[in-house]
Protein backbone atom coordinates (compact mmCIF):
# COMPACT_ATOMS: atom_id res chain seq x y z
CA UNK A 1 0.00 0.00 0.00
CA UNK A 2 1.17 3.48 -0.84
CA UNK A 3 1.57 6.05 1.89
CA UNK A 4 -1.49 8.21 2.47
CA UNK A 5 0.65 11.28 1.82
CA UNK A 6 1.45 10.03 -1.70
CA UNK A 7 -2.23 9.44 -2.45
CA UNK A 8 -3.09 12.90 -1.12
CA UNK A 9 -0.32 14.47 -3.20
CA UNK A 10 -1.75 12.96 -6.39
CA UNK A 11 -5.25 14.22 -5.53
CA UNK A 12 -3.83 17.69 -4.89
CA UNK A 13 -2.00 17.64 -8.24
CA UNK A 14 -5.17 16.56 -10.06
CA UNK A 15 -7.09 19.49 -8.56
CA UNK A 16 -4.32 21.91 -9.55
CA UNK A 17 -4.27 20.58 -13.13
CA UNK A 18 -8.05 21.04 -13.39
CA UNK A 19 -7.83 24.56 -11.96
CA UNK A 20 -5.21 25.76 -14.47
CA UNK A 21 -6.33 23.74 -17.53
CA UNK A 22 -8.18 26.60 -19.26
CA UNK A 23 -5.45 29.15 -18.56
CA UNK A 24 -2.77 26.71 -19.74
CA UNK A 25 -4.65 26.06 -23.00
CA UNK A 26 -5.09 29.80 -23.60
CA UNK A 27 -1.41 30.57 -22.99
CA UNK A 28 -0.33 27.72 -25.26
CA UNK A 29 -2.60 28.98 -28.05
CA UNK A 30 -1.16 32.49 -27.72
CA UNK A 31 2.39 31.15 -27.65
CA UNK A 32 3.11 32.97 -24.39
CA UNK A 33 5.70 30.53 -23.06
CA UNK A 34 7.09 32.87 -20.40
CA UNK A 35 3.70 33.08 -18.70
CA UNK A 36 3.28 29.34 -19.14
CA UNK A 37 6.52 28.78 -17.26
CA UNK A 38 5.28 31.01 -14.44
CA UNK A 39 2.43 28.59 -13.68
CA UNK A 40 2.98 26.13 -10.82
CA UNK A 41 4.94 22.98 -11.72
CA UNK A 42 2.19 20.72 -10.45
CA UNK A 43 -0.34 22.43 -12.73
CA UNK A 44 1.12 20.50 -15.66
CA UNK A 45 -0.79 17.32 -16.59
CA UNK A 46 2.53 15.57 -17.28
CA UNK A 47 3.20 15.43 -13.54
CA UNK A 48 0.08 13.35 -12.84
CA UNK A 49 0.57 9.64 -12.27
CA UNK A 50 -2.18 7.03 -12.36
CA UNK A 51 -2.61 5.19 -9.08
CA UNK A 52 -4.71 2.23 -8.01
CA UNK A 53 -7.96 3.42 -6.39
CA UNK A 54 -7.73 0.71 -3.74
CA UNK A 55 -4.06 0.44 -2.79
CA UNK A 56 -2.48 3.55 -4.32
CA UNK A 57 0.05 1.42 -6.21
CA UNK A 58 1.66 3.54 -8.97
CA UNK A 59 2.83 0.71 -11.22
CA UNK A 60 0.83 -1.95 -13.03
CA UNK A 61 -2.20 0.34 -13.39
CA UNK A 62 -5.04 -0.95 -15.60
CA UNK A 63 -6.87 2.08 -17.03
CA UNK A 64 -10.08 0.26 -17.91
CA UNK A 65 -10.74 -0.54 -14.25
CA UNK A 66 -8.73 2.13 -12.43
CA UNK A 67 -6.94 -0.44 -10.28
CA UNK A 68 -3.59 -2.24 -10.28
CA UNK A 69 -3.04 -5.59 -11.97
CA UNK A 70 -2.76 -7.32 -8.60
CA UNK A 71 -6.10 -6.00 -7.36
CA UNK A 72 -7.67 -6.78 -10.75
CA UNK A 73 -6.59 -10.41 -10.51
CA UNK A 74 -7.75 -10.74 -6.92
CA UNK A 75 -11.14 -9.11 -7.53
CA UNK A 76 -11.72 -11.04 -10.77
CA UNK A 77 -10.93 -14.33 -9.01
CA UNK A 78 -13.44 -13.49 -6.29
CA UNK A 79 -16.08 -12.52 -8.87
CA UNK A 80 -16.24 -8.89 -7.76
CA UNK A 81 -15.89 -7.42 -11.26
CA UNK A 82 -18.95 -8.08 -13.44
CA UNK A 83 -18.19 -9.67 -16.81
CA UNK A 84 -14.60 -10.57 -15.98
CA UNK A 85 -13.56 -14.17 -15.58
CA UNK A 86 -10.43 -16.24 -15.87
CA UNK A 87 -9.68 -17.35 -19.42
CA UNK A 88 -9.68 -21.05 -20.23
CA UNK A 89 -9.58 -22.80 -23.57
Swiss-Prot record:
Any one annotated GO CC term: cytoplasm
UniProt keyword annotations, A-Z: Ribonucleoprotein, Ribosomal protein, RNA-binding, rRNA-binding
Superkingdom of this protein's organism: Bacteria
Cross-referenced InterPro entries: Ribosomal_uS14, Ribosomal_uS14_bac/plastid, Ribosomal_uS14_CS, Ribosomal_uS14_sf
UniProt-recorded Gene Ontology molecular function terms: rRNA binding; structural constituent of ribosome
Keyword Phosphoprotein attributed: no
Transmembrane intervals: none
GO BP annotations listed: translation
UniProt KW Lyase keyword: no
Function as written in the Swiss-Prot or TrEMBL entry: Binds 16S rRNA, required for the assembly of 30S particles and may also be responsible for determining the conformation of the 16S rRNA at the A site.
PANTHER family per record: 30S RIBOSOMAL PROTEIN S14, SMALL RIBOSOMAL SUBUNIT PROTEIN US14M
Family membership noted in the UniProt record: Belongs to the universal ribosomal protein uS14 family.
Complex formation: Part of the 30S ribosomal subunit. Contacts proteins S3 and S10.
HAMAP family referenced in this protein's UniProt entry, alphabetically: Ribosomal_uS14_1
NCBIfam families assigned: PRK08881.1
Protein name, per record: Small ribosomal subunit protein uS14
Gene expressing this chain: rpsN
